[in-house]
Amino acid sequence: MNKQILRNVILAGLFLVPFIPFLVSSSFFFPFITTKAFAWMIIEEIIFATWILLALIDVDSRPKKSTILYAVLSFLVVIGLADLLGVAPIKSFWSNFERMEGFITLLHLGMFFAVVSSVFNEIDWKKWWNTSLAASFLLVLYCLLQIIGLKTINQGGVRVDGTLGNSIYLAVYMLFHIFIALLFMWRERQKTFLRWVYGLLILSQASILYYTATRGAILGLLGGILIAALLNIRNKEDRLVRKISIACLVALVVLVGGFSVVKDSAFIESSPVLARFSNLNLDSIKSQGRYFVWPMAWEGVKERPILGWGQENFSYVFQEHYRPEMFNLEPWFDRAHNIFLDWAVAGGFLGLLSYLALYLALMLSIWKSSAGFSYTEKSILTGLIAAYFFHNFFVFDNLVSYVLFFSLLAYVNSRVSGEKSSVQPVVESYKKNIVLPIVVILAALSLYFVNIKPMMTNIFLIDALKSVQTPGQIPAATEYFKKAYSTSRLGRPEVLEHLSANSVPIFSSDISMEEKNSFFTFTKDALLKETGGLDKDARHQLMVGSFLSTTGFLDEALIRLDKAKALIPNKQQIYFEMGAVYINKGELPKALEVFREAYELAPGYVEARVIYLIGAIYAGERVIENEMIAKISEREVVFDDRIIQAYNSNGRKNEVVSLLESRIRLDPANADTYRKYIEEVTK
């Protein structure tokens, strides 16, 4: 084993990491997440295996004992134990395609930390951070193309998201790099050209941060600058820095004070970014998901305070404490949108403390004299930590921000002096005959089962979804679905979800009855098989119930829907599904009763009113029907096809004609179409 070759392999892999944010492939399901995650994990597994071999022959490449190292190990151990003892250990380990986190990601972050903190010296770090800054500038250029309209903003709207697919993810990426650029601008302050390069880079990054319109990150930036400036007021090493810090404090006061004065002006209201700050008040907060999910998360922490629920299990807390007033928010939350609450839910107070210990260890190490940072550098890095900390109060982390955070941990760790964890030489024959084969075999197995097979599942799933939408490709779609389900455990929740969701177009296609029966049997077996491990997952029970209802197994559907209702009793969607089953069974009074329960959960929910009205029409309850019509706007009644269908099914043609005539009055542009419908009804 050649030490230099091994080191070069590791360096090559590490210097690819800054460019991972650019990776997006439409061949993958959740392309902005999975493309980056698979590439990163493959790189980490290769360089970690290489590093194991290097550490055997090079004592200098072995990790050194440090506060940060112990904090990282403690975090991994505590969260690993929490996942193992949590409500869904397999789910906690693998996560899903939408997030690509779970304990498997934490293990890779630990591997990344071990390698980069042991191998990089100060020169390597300088090159690596500057490579990352160069990559951030390329991303700035891409975002500029989005701003001027030459590139599409992936999430829609006006908030730029670059190649990360989410403006919040882009914001924290820019936030990190602003402070790193500031750090290097200070170090290179004597070189005019570099000072200008870093300065312009900071301005460009800050501009993109502004166009993300991410309040948490922007306020985090201001807060980070505030902390750095306050610290530098006591800077005895450089008078100029003290003066600049005072100027920054004055500028912040003027900025905040000035904004509060003009926040209601037409200029502010016309700005999509500034308006998000001016409209931030108690009423707007009450309409956000965080207003509801933060108290939910706290209740979940109190229920399992020591080691929590395990990663990826916030959904169990959500369903237990769901409030019916949340009907106008996204239907399912899998995060608390506060990283500290998320870790408290996932790992209990021990998990939260182990996560906070990472920040504490980082701060202590930065301010250690052995780290060799100047006072100004310490202040800048502390400002970065403060900015990131504040930002995380309102969001959850993603792979890119995790990598940047662990890079910072590794960088500071490499600056702190400490003795190597081991300096014992390893016998040559032991290295060649035992360690080398074991490392190669384990690396190959990991690459195959952790990356290759899940990637195959991911591609099979996206191919299945494309085939469903392509005429004549339904047979191919069914085969892709089967392959996606059987290939890998990672991504199976999404496979099951889309198996169920796409059953109707497959069953209504022109494939043979034998093929339909085969697909039905496969889908039903897959859904019911997974139900054993997801017995307490309300969303899965609802999905199974909906599938069984769609395919005509009404009694079995009610069993699953009753289970879902017991798990999340305040979710109106489940009541709607149950009522539809009762209507299909001809048990109209039961359907009306279920719809009434859904309506009474949140009388302000317009959809619940409409559904209750439909139930009353089917059940022939005219009093309830008239009561609900009085509570729904005319347009909502007139243009809802479900209401017309209910009247038509009950033979009430006069009401159907009346609604269609109202459509002619309210929508004269399509009057001819409505007249044709009237003719068909009155034949």
Locations of regions flagged by a protein language model:
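Flexible juxtamembrane loops connecting transmembrane helices in multi-pass membrane enzymes
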Residues: 159-160, 224-225, 240-243, 256-302, ...
